[in-house]
Structures are given as structure tokens and as C-alpha cells.
């Protein structure tokens, strides 16, 4: 699966009146305020999420990785996992892992079923971050957060890497060579772009966040 690795998460849901924790490796971003949690239909936790429409999504650090690995290896149908993590109740009423560097309280807004999977579309209601993973401006610093990544094909845990460059500002060369006109309304966010003359008007119309536009003649 070429889109691995992804951040490893521990999802909490209430099932039959008790807290249950489950590792989820299939996650995604939908827009700026929605996330996707994709879970095999075989999981015990799915019905609890469908019933309550609430869950918490907890990122995993190296410190809590052993416990996360454990809750991902046993089923809540046969093992009571409610006390594996120390937790508190978030503002939206869902348990939040005390030691997680970052947790999102979510509400399920839609569910899409695909073969073998329940796919929960979730709105983020609250986000909690440990002070030690924030920069001086109160923003997330991923060099401090260092979430554990899960690589699905080999079932391996990876560490987050170093920063290798700043987006849209890698060097002085054009960020993109535009050979075709834009076919739909949208935003192109690039530090520089080269455009063939016949497409210049089209790109000037849509590319509102390009730092510098130049003509490509060869």
C-alpha cells in the first residue's frame, strides 16, 4: 500500500457501557475540519461508535507505544482494555489518554461502508496538545511531537523524520512548469511558476497564491 505509513492512532469508543481502546492505522484528512477513520468490520469497537457517534483519536508517542501495541493485539470482545491507559474525560464527554501528545475529540457525521470496512467521517470538536509539543507561538511543532507512524504492509512502527525543507520555498527554481491551462476554478500555491504565454491569463486568474510568475518560451 503506497500511501503508508500513517500516524498510529488509538481510538476510544464506549461499547456496552465500558471504555474500549483500539489501534487504527487507516486514517485520513478530509478538508480542514474532517478526518477519516477506517476500521475493519470485524472490530468489536465499530458498533459502539455507530451507537454513540462519538470517539477520541489519540496520537501515539514512543512512551505509550507498548500499551498501544497491546490494545491493538487483543479484542475488546474478550479482554477488558478500559484501564490500559490512564485517561480523563474531555469537554465533549469522551475519554482522552493522559499521556497522548495530541488528542482529538470527534463526532461522527457520516459513515461509508466499503467491502470489509466501516469508514467514519468525523468532525473535530476539540483538540488537546501537551505543552511540550508546542512551539513558542502555541502551534504544533512536529519535531517535538514526533508521532509514531504505522507502516501497514510490513506491520512496522516508524519514527517521524527530520525536516528536510520548507514547502513552497525550496530553492530559486520554478516550483512548477505549467504546460496546460487550468480546467477548473482552484488555487495554485507555489513559490514560483513558469507558464507558456498562451496560458498566462488563465493562470493569473486562478493562481492567487503564487509568489512569482514568469513566461516559459522553449
Give names to the regions the model predicted:
Residues 1-218:
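Basic, polyanion-binding surface patches
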Amino acid at each position: 500500500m503506497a500511501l503508508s505509513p500513517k500516524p498510529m492512532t488509538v481510538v476510544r469508543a464506549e461499547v456496552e457501557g465500558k471504555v474500549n481502546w483500539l489501534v487504527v492505522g487507516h486514517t485520513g484528512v478530509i478538508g480542514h475540519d474532517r478526518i477519516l477513520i477506517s476500521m475493519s468490520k470485524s472490530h468489536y469497537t465499530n458498533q459502539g461508535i455507530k451507537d454513540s457517534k462519538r470517539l477520541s483519536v489519540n496520537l501515539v508517542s514512543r512512551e505509550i507505544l507498548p500499551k498501544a501495541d497491546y490494545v491493538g493485539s487483543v479484542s475488546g470482545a474478550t479482554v477488558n482494555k478500559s484501564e490500559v491507559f490512564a485517561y480523563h474525560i474531555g469537554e465533549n464527554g469522551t475519554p482522552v489518554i493522559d499521556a497522548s501528545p495530541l488528542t482529538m475529540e470527534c463526532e461522527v457525521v457520516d459513515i461509508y461502508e466499503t467491502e470489509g470496512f466501516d469508514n467514519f467521517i468525523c468532525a473535530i470538536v476539540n483538540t488537546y496538545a501537551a505543552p511540550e509539543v508546542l512551539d513558542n507561538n502555541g502551534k504544533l511543532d512536529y519535531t517535538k511531537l514526533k508521532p509514531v507512524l504505522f507502516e501497514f504492509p510490513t506491520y512496522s512502527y516508524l519514527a517521524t523524520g527530520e525536516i528536510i525543507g520548507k514547502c513552497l520555498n525550496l530553492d530559486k527554481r520554478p516550483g512548477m512548469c505549467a504546460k496546460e491551462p487550468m480546467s477548473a476554478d482552484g488555487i495554485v500555491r507555489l513559490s514560483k511558476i513558469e507558464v507558456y504565454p498562451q496560458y498566462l491569463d488563465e493562470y493569473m486568474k486562478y493562481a492567487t497564491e503564487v509568489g512569482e510568475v514568469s513566461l516559459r518560451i522553449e
